[in-house]
Amino acid sequence: MQYIPLKEKYEKEIRNAMMKEFGYKNIHQVPRLEKIVINMGIGEGSRNKDVIDIHAKELALIAGQKPVVTRAKKSISNFKIRKGMPIGLKVTLRGLRMYNFLYKLINLVLPKVRDFRGLNPNGFDGRGNYSFGLTEQLVFPEISPDQVRRVQGMDIVIVTTAKTDEEARKLLELFGFPFKRQ
């Protein structure tokens, strides 16, 4: 088996397979990946600025670009959060970085997840976008277990131009996503 970058694979194989299956007349009608958003919600970040900095460095290593600090939209007294306090990090990947991250996710990260039986097929939102979470950042090859002070999970959202969940699922399956059998 030869390594083919995912963007090339999409243009040569996946797009044609999708056109045949769904009967598209034009290649521009075929769903494609738009972006991947990685979000880390860090509740402790409002009290400890160092935690945000540590996880920002980790997320930058994982994604290949600097994350944006997300801030609280409004104050919530029960959580001791004021408006504007840092409560998380997010990265939006597009273009080549998106395809590189997707390749790493499918081939390196998901196989390393403990007790992994496949991705939940119910993670679609009705508009062709897929969301799932990882419970720890240690499954990424860039993160060394010795340097991790605190295990932190993340949410990953894959945004496609697909109109329906069925089209999006087929697109992601052709990219190599390991979904659970229903």
Curated annotation (Swiss-Prot):
Tell me where the transmembrane regions lie: none
Keyword terms = Ribonucleoprotein, Ribosomal protein, RNA-binding, rRNA-binding, tRNA-binding
InterPro entries given in the database record: Ribosomal_uL5, Ribosomal_uL5_bac-type, Ribosomal_uL5_C, Ribosomal_uL5_CS, Ribosomal_uL5_dom_sf, Ribosomal_uL5_N
Q: State whether keyword tRNA-binding applies.
A: yes
Per the record, its GO cellular-component terms are: ribonucleoprotein complex; ribosome
Say yes or no: keyword tRNA-binding present.
yes
Pfam families recorded: Ribosomal_L5, Ribosomal_L5_C
Q: Name one GO molecular function term.
A: rRNA binding
Superkingdom of the organism of origin: Bacteria
Q: Mind listing the GO biological process terms from this record?
A: translation
Which PANTHER family would you find in this protein's record? 60S RIBOSOMAL PROTEIN L11-RELATED (PTHR11994)
**Cross-referenced HAMAP family, in alphabetical order?**
Ribosomal_uL5_B
Q: What does this protein do?
A: This is one of the proteins that bind and probably mediate the attachment of the 5S RNA into the large ribosomal subunit, where it forms part of the central protuberance. In the 70S ribosome it contacts protein S13 of the 30S subunit (bridge B1b), connecting the 2 subunits; this bridge is implicated in subunit movement. Contacts the P site tRNA; the 5S rRNA and some of its associated proteins might help stabilize positioning of ribosome-bound tRNAs.
Family assignment from sequence similarity: Belongs to the universal ribosomal protein uL5 family.
Please describe the quaternary structure of this protein: Part of the 50S ribosomal subunit; part of the 5S rRNA/L5/L18/L25 subcomplex. Contacts the 5S rRNA and the P site tRNA. Forms a bridge to the 30S subunit in the 70S ribosome.
Q: Which NCBIfam families match?
A: PRK00010.1
**Protein name per its UniProtKB record:** Large ribosomal subunit protein uL5
What organism is recorded for this protein? Thermosipho melanesiensis (strain DSM 12029 / CIP 104789 / BI429)
- UniProt lineage: Bacteria, Thermotogati, Thermotogota, Thermotogae, Thermotogales
